[in-house]
Amino acid sequence: MASSSLLVTIFLCISVFFFSSVNANEVTVGGKSGDWKIPPSSSFSFNEWAQKARFKVGDFIVFKYEAGKDSVLQVTREAYEKCNTTSPKASYTDGNTKVKLDQAGPVYFVSGTEGHCQKGQKLRLVVITPRNSAFSPGPSPSEFDGPAVAPTSGAAKLAGGFSVVFGLVLGLWAFFF
């Protein structure tokens, strides 16, 4: 009897982990072309691209670029606005950078190559908190400077709600049987 409860508990933990990670997305900067480089024309803007996408806490943003010739810097709003690359929050140089978006609010990235930010190789995106997560931290008041993005889709809310209910049912079943 105890071994079946242990198996159910292990299954419960795996299930909750699986269903909570199902909602995370990987979004490549720039869309299908996926290149982190100076925009080829003034008609393309990384910020306009980002406004058409939805980023939520737990998602990953992926930057693809030539390692050794470029880099990605996560910076403050002030550094983003001035294209200041001297004191980044984080620096990435591997050519295939995957950054987890772990906090709601605006996030700022610029190229670490001199002169590239001034030519438009910079990105501001807004990360939203999924409605099915009550524990994600909000943005700090000094960092948040833009409007909120619309809430997540009904499918994401349904999947999150299902994982909570499923976990509770399995937990109760394991406890009593």
UniProtKB/Swiss-Prot annotation:
It is found in: Cell membrane. Keywords: Cell membrane, Disulfide bond, Glycoprotein, GPI-anchor, Lipoprotein, Membrane, Signal. May act as a carbohydrate transporter. Required, together with ENODL11, ENODL12, ENODL13, ENODL14 and ENODL15, for male-female communication and pollen tube reception and burst at the synergid cell surface of the female gametophyte. Residues 1-24 form the signal peptide. This is Early nodulin-like protein 15. The keyword rRNA-binding does not apply. It comes from Arabidopsis thaliana (Mouse-ear cress). SUPFAM superfamilies: Cupredoxins. Its main location: membrane. Belongs to the early nodulin-like (ENODL) family. Disulfide bonds join 83-117. Mostly expressed in seedlings, siliques and flowers, and, to a lower extent, in roots, stems and seeds, but barely in leaves. Gene3D superfamilies: Cupredoxins - blue copper proteins. A lipid is attached at residue 153 (GPI-anchor amidated serine).
